[in-house]
Amino acid sequence: MEYRILGRTGLKVGAIALGCEGFADKTAEEVRADFDFAIRNGINFLDLYASNPELRSNIGAALAGRREKFVIQGHLCSVWEGGQYLRTRDPEKSLAAFEDLLARLGTDYVEIGMIHYVDAEADLREVLDGPIMRLAQRLRSEGRIRHIGLSSHNPVVAHMAARTGLIDVLMFSVNPCYDLLPPSDDVDTLWADESYARELHNIDPERQRLYEFCEREGIVIDVMKAYGGGDLLSDANSPFGRPMTPVQCLEYALTRPGVAAVMAGCRSRAEIEAALAWCSATAAERDYTGALAGLDKFSWEGHCMYCGHCAPCSVGIDIAGVNKYYNLTLAQHEIPETVREHYRLLPHHASECIACGRCERNCPFGVDIIGHMRLAAAKFGY
């Protein structure tokens, strides 16, 4: 398992984490067996948005005696009414559901209290200015939440939330398909066939700005929908018309700026194993470029995907790293100190580029790498 620091929370989590909704139809014994397997393989981070009381109790039983082995991300505003899940902004219902979560998990706190599913700007304003944020802050002051997070599928809303300084963790949907789409407050557009009927080129700029802002400011992203609800794993369902592997989807998500972990939604032991395969996968197995390059309607032409195919550099420059740190400066009047320091620590810098062109011949996306190195050298001064 590769472990990463969860931004400014300081928490250390495995890059492959558990989204627990897939355990809903399992017995307590089956859930405990899956948790045994997860622990043996280094998984220490889980997300639980589901309000289903039986699922919560089964996960609590699986955690019994080993609560300390997990960083738990539990959701506020997810309640159980009339035998089904409901999203709410009612503070009393949200508090009662959160207290039910703690009781059923057998713990008195969660590391991350995730304000659940905020996709519309009006909803975000209600959350930030109303009783829900006050509730989250109160729970944090009481120690029942250690850090506040927010989940969203809309990059504009997510960016607005991140800029407030009120959240430390963002749960966001990341995969190469969604990254092409413009912002929307209707999550259903992410799955709609008509969204992909026209030509789409490069990562949507709102998403790129969100990822780079989070990287700069230490607001960490944990990822949902890395497989696009499973569609990206199927040639019949993928908008690309060709399947990706779980490892390729995970590699894509885990190489985006700001991302620390992926909450893999797994319904079987085989699916947990498929996600864990990322940890031991070869560079060839992680390589997602073959699934993305050469598509008729979809193009990432000229956009650095941080895939590393440009390597090896004749003088040893980490080209993907230089591009990432340069891109992090673009929206800033001054270079953030954290970005400047990360660039300084690179063993070789953009000014060392000899313009041999070897990297450009290797790049599957036609990036003007030599030009990017000149821009980075001018920006950073070396």
PLM regions: where:
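Iron-sulfur (Fe-S) cluster-binding segments and ferredoxin-like electron-carrier domains
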Residues: 314-330, 361, 365-379
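Conserved, mostly hydrophobic/aromatic
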Residues: 6, 18, 38, 46, ...
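Short, acidic/polar
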Residues: 26-38, 89-106, 152-160, 244-252
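Active-site groove signature of glycoside hydrolases
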Residues: 100-124
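Beta/alpha (TIM)-barrel catalytic core signal, keyed to glycine-rich beta->alpha loops juxtaposed to Asp/Glu
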Residues: 118-321, 331-345, 371
